Amino acid sequence: MILMITAPVCPPHLLLRHSSLLRHESSIGNFHRKKNPRFRTVSCSSLLPQPSVRPDKASELKTLWKKFYKVASPYWFSEDKDQARLRLAAVFALTLATTGISVGFNFLGRDFYNSLANKDQEQFTKQLFYYLCAFAGGIPFFVLRDYTKETLSLRWRSWMTKYYLQRYLKDQTFYKIQSQSIIDNPDQRLVDDLSSFTGTALSFSLTLVNATIDLISFSNILFTIYPPLFLVLLLYSFGGTAISVFLGKGLVNLNFLQEKKEADFRYSLVRVRENAESIAFYGGEQNEMQLLLQRFRSAFDNLTELLIASRNLEFFTDGYRYLIQILPVAVVAPMYFSGKIEFGVINQSVSAFNHILGDFSLVVYQFQAISSFSAVIDRLGEFDDLLDNNIFRDPSDTVDEIELTYQSEMNSSLLDTNGSIKSQPNQKRLEIEELTLQTPTNGTTLVHNLSADVYDKDHLLIMGPSGSGKTSLLRAMAGLWRSGKGKITFYLDPEVDFTQEKSDTQENSGKRGDVLFLPQRPYMVLGSLRQQLLYPTWSATVEETTPGGSNIDGSPPLLIREDGNEKPTTDDLMRTLEKVCLGHIADRFGGLDSIHEWSSVLSLGEQQRLAFARLLLSQPKLALLDESTSALDEANEAFLYQQIQSAGITYISIGHRRTLTKFHNKILQISTADPKSNERNWRIEDVDAQDSLYGRLNQKEVPSES
């Protein structure tokens, strides 16, 4: 509701003041207003949002402040601190200037209305000219203050987004958060919460500073005019705040529930979109319709309760807003009638009264925004603590943990007398020692005391019934699961530099270069066909990196390949596509640099062949294949295995088809573990040479690309 106020009650200088305040309110409550249709913007002192702060927040202010400081402080001590502090100082300087301009307008208004009441046309013309000049000179300060604040907020958000993303993607933290359900919606925290935090923190800080200076300046003016009016203001503002909080406390849970229920409804719609084909095959449209309507009805019913509660609160707030327009006039009117003050002083007292009331009622006016901001601080504080500690305990509280290491073979048999590295014809690639693997959720044992070695040119097939732990074993090899005990050791290329110790990050980089995992459903990145092929080994945007391999700003590139491995050329990529029978898709989709939703436009079989193309380009020492040919026919499956075997890649496969045995020389057979027994539930056996790929290399059959 926008109140239209006559000039004696809300003069132009006061409207300028209130338009500035409303911009602050817009910044502070921006994200909440998008979600809550009951949040309205009104002019002057007519905004009284519904409270939505949890009742127990008062007792947690100290904790909230600590979280706020922990989240906010890194930027102000970062490499961008000089620019940040300079811009912040400029914002505060402009805030002081705008407060001074508002005080000047207050006195201009007094003289302006005095000349009008005295019917002094010459003085009125002069004061009108002063007013127009003051507007022309004052408005740029208000605009520049808001612009400087918004650019600082954008700069802060950019830095924080990169800061949190680096920590989120480090050491597989993102996977641990998702797989163990430690916190909800990390993506929302990285996007919505970070955006809201930076904008609201600056806006609220600016509003507090502005309100403090404003309160001091106009309290002196109001107290000079009529001290009892200052007392009336205190009683009115504190009383209104208390009543509003009391009447609006029922809105707290309703607002939070509304956000959750609407999010649930949106998520249901996203699931329909992502699983459209499966739903269509099942003919499950009616079931989906019922589920969607059920969630919509839940949100609708809660919103109805929210509207009723808001209506009840507005019975008070509307009266509060209207009464404020005549209350100061009613208090000082007897002084005007007795001749103790001029008419312009009435306008001055109304202006000062509205300024001070706005400052005293700041908590009331920003109640809903403050509650939303406190929720943002809670969520980001929780997220920040999680990323800082980087400690993920298994819910089963397993004491033992699988030891996963990456090292190089370094012994006397590997070195000549002059210290150079000997050529090793059968290098060990993987060693598993006494591995007992358990699920991270409830500690159920999947594999008992597994020991196995995989050497160069070995091809191991892991088989077993569904749920026996085949894929879980690969998760343990990838470092995704640590529940259990035992040791897994990957042996890197012996050509690495032994003279330098490797950090954890360097070891992980080495692991990424030497071991590549192919899941059953390959991950299709957002980008071009070229990026699909280069992922995850090389960056697709070389021009954005320095010769040393880092980004221009000094950070590591998103996709890393060890030095000495040249990035494939366009011809290399096309030849590799031909090797996996996908030479036609570049023409089909407009070239290597065309961008599509690849997980939708390519069939699962084509995606699996594309994953094998990545494997051939990366040339890892060891490949872990989790049913990576499940969507392919036997001819294509055989052809792809022949390609990677010819490339000299050692691989470990998981599969159910007996036809896979001919592509391997060893089989690890896993049976379902007996929870009451500690006996091993696995065996390793050799595959008959004549059934293996070694005996079939001369019988190659090239399948069709269709």
From Swiss-Prot:
Question: Which Gene Ontology cellular-component terms appear in the entry?
Answer: chloroplast; membrane
In residue numbers, the region (Disordered) covers 545-569
Q: Does the keyword Acetylation apply?
A: yes
Q: Which residues bind ATP?
A: 464-471
Transferase listed as a keyword: no
Q: Any idea where the ABC transmembrane type-1 domain is?
A: 88-372
Biased-composition ranges for Basic and acidic residues?
Answer: 560-569
PROSITE patterns (UniProt xref): ABC_TM1F, ABC_TRANSPORTER_1, ABC_TRANSPORTER_2
Short name of one Pfam family: ABC_tran
State its Enzyme Commission number(s). Answer: 7.-.-.-
One GO molecular-function annotation for this sequence? ATP hydrolysis activity
Swiss-Prot/TrEMBL keywords: Acetylation, ATP-binding, Chloroplast, Membrane, Nucleotide-binding, Plastid, Transit peptide, Translocase, Transmembrane, Transmembrane helix, Transport
ABC transporter domain location is 430-697
Places the protein is found: Membrane; Plastid, Chloroplast
Residues crossing the lipid bilayer are: 88-108, 124-144, 200-222, 237-257, 326-346
Q: Which family does it belong to?
A: Belongs to the ABC transporter superfamily. ABCD family. Peroxisomal fatty acyl CoA transporter (TC 3.A.1.203) subfamily.
* Subunit annotation: Homodimer or heterodimer.
**Which protein is depicted?**
ABC transporter D family member 2, chloroplastic
Q: Which organism is it from?
A: Arabidopsis thaliana (Mouse-ear cress)
